[in-house]
Each structure stands twice: as C-alpha cells, then as structure tokens.
Amino acid sequence: ATLVDRIVPGFPRKDIAAIKEKLQYDDNLVVQAEVFHLWVIEAPQEVAKEFPADKAGLNVLFVPSEAPYHERKVTLLNGPHTVLSPVAYLSGVNIVRDACQHEVIGKYIHKVMFDELMETLNLPKEELKKFAEDVLERFNNPFVDHAVTSIMLNSFPKYETRDLPGLKTYLQRKGELPKGLVLGLAAIITYYKGGVREDGCLLYTSP
C-alpha cells in the first residue's frame, strides 16, 4: 500500500500567462501544486536501497503500515477540506486560504479539526495536533489559490469516506452529534439543492 499527500489545486489560470512567459513556450498541461509532499510506502526499510527515491529529492517514508498515515491524512486534511468548502462558498468565500483567515469560518475549521475529527482518532494527541497545525499552515499557503469549488466536486461520496466515519465515531464516544460536521453536511445539501449566491445572499433556484 502507498499514500501520497500533496495539495494539487490544478491548472493555474491566474498565473498561466506569466508561467508561459517564463517557460518561453505554451504548455496547457501545467499543474499547480504546493511545495510540501509526502510519499508513504508500506515496505521494509531495505527497499530504500533498491528504490532510492530520496536521491531524486522526494520525501519518502518506508513504513511497516501505511494505515495510520492514511487515516490521519484523510481525517485531518481531506475531512476539513470537504466540509469547509461548501460552508465557505455559501458564505461568499472562494479560496481555501481566505476561508481559513475568515473571522467566523476560520474558527469553524479549527473546531472541526481539533474538537471533532481529532477526537475520533486513536493516535498520539501531540502527534495529531502537530499534523493538524501543519495542515492549517498548508491551507493558508499564500502562493496557492485553491478554489473551494474544485474541492466540492463529488462532495457526497467525499463526505461519506472522509467525514461520516468521524461523525459516527464522535456520536458513539460523546453521545451527541458533532455540530461542525453536521453543518458541513447541511451546506453540501444546500449547495446541491440549488443554493446560489447573489449580492451576498443565498438563493434557491429549485425547491
């Protein structure tokens, strides 16, 4: 099993002209990505000798089990992405970074990550806090304009795999629903029901 962790917003529409000027040729397949990257490979350390990916400048970990890295990443990176995006969009915020820096939405994201999703994982708390703090720093990357609408594609299956397990675990452990995750689901439903923005107001285009 392997895991790749890297935020890849896709085609850099805003900067493509400057990029082509720098390259001195047209490349319509340019993909933007953050500098951070992690490649986790479930294999013995000896494999590193046969596959010295680090010599190519890649951040690769050879580990006995990929599972805890997968669970941590899906829960504390993908999970918040999935719920913050519709909440941000319906609030008139288009970029992940701006959502994190928003007075209200920023607190919402922090609550979902630290007070709800983190409580559902069985990994060392300090390790989880450090990972979550690093994720927030990545979300705030000033060089990457990550559109929330790109994250909102296929929101229902994303929520089912990234957030619903945490919601169920939280309910089982705490005896109550996690309000942030419930709000995220409500925002997804609102968006897919036809909720649109106009002059700062949320309108419905269908019943």
Can you name each region flagged by the protein language model?
Residues 1-206:
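Substrate/ligand-engaging "lid" and interaction regions
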